[in-house]
């Protein structure tokens, strides 16, 4: 009998896992601050968390129909989640909410360039700071 090859398991430390934004109100609040940076692979929006919500950074992902069909949108969001998981814990600011918006080329963009896009957008957003309006 042939044995199935065992897949390597990813070690996920639950304390390091990113908290996701889920409500429409949170997405609209972040969009309303206008602290944003656009790059070829993504758009990043940022806002400080309201009140005392725990101080851990939170992140949301979105991809409109402009990105492509459902398969392309889901692939783009998966790639944004992977990029955020590798960049935000080290470079994101505690107490901030981030929204990553996929663009038309997100699903085909080389992963290294997607990481560079996110890092550059984080630097730009941290320089700008949120402007209420």
Please name every model-derived segment.
Residues 1-133:
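Positively charged, solvent-exposed patches that mediate nucleic-acid binding
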């Amino acid at each position: 009998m042939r044995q199935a090859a065992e897949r390597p398991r990813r070690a996920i430390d639950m304390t390091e896992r990113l908290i996701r934004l889920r409500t429409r109100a949170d997405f609209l609040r972040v969009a309303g601050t206008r602290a944003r940076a656009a790059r070829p692979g993504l758009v990043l929006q940022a806002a400080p968390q309201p009140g005392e919500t725990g101080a851990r950074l939170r992140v949301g992902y979105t991809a409109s129909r402009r990105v492509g069909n459902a398969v392309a949108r889901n692939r783009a969001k998966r790639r944004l989640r992977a990029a955020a998981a590798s960049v935000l814990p080290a470079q994101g600011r505690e107490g901030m909410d981030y929204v990553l918006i996929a663009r038309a080329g997100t699903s085909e963009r080389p992963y290294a360039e997607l990481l560079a896009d996110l890092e550059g957008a984080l630097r730009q957003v941290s320089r700008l700071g949120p402007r209420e309006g």
